[in-house]
Amino acid sequence: MVIEHLSDLPSESIDAPVAESEQAGWRFMRRLAEEWASGANRFDGAGEAFFAALIGGRVIGVCGLNVDPYTVAQGVGRVRHLYVLSAYRRLGVGQQLVGRVIEAARARFDILRLSTQNPAAQLYERLGFRRCVGAADCTHLMELR
């Protein structure tokens, strides 16, 4: 498996993650595909990045880094769209993807935030994120500096 920084995301490359996530009742992967296709979010702003985990050229997981759109504070990044195909979960793929996002975020951001409503919360906490209190748009954060 390799983790690559992507600047292009052909829609067919994430068909499997989009389909699997929708079967599980999650729409965020569909939103990722639509926003990339429309140009609304291609993770190409200052300090932003998008990573994919690949096996044999096949995307098995993704995770992105954006400037946090939910705050006006400077120096705040946001972890976006972490998804790993179910067959590859609990193998460290998500940990490696988020690790690359954290590494990229350290170059530009002071704080990294995210929002999750699923079991990935435990992964984020193991990686050093702590729970946000009193913020509707944030469940976890990490101070980078």
Walk through the language-model features, giving the residues of each:
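A short helix-loop-beta-strand connector motif used in the catalytic cores of GNAT acetyltransferases and
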Residues: 40-52, 78
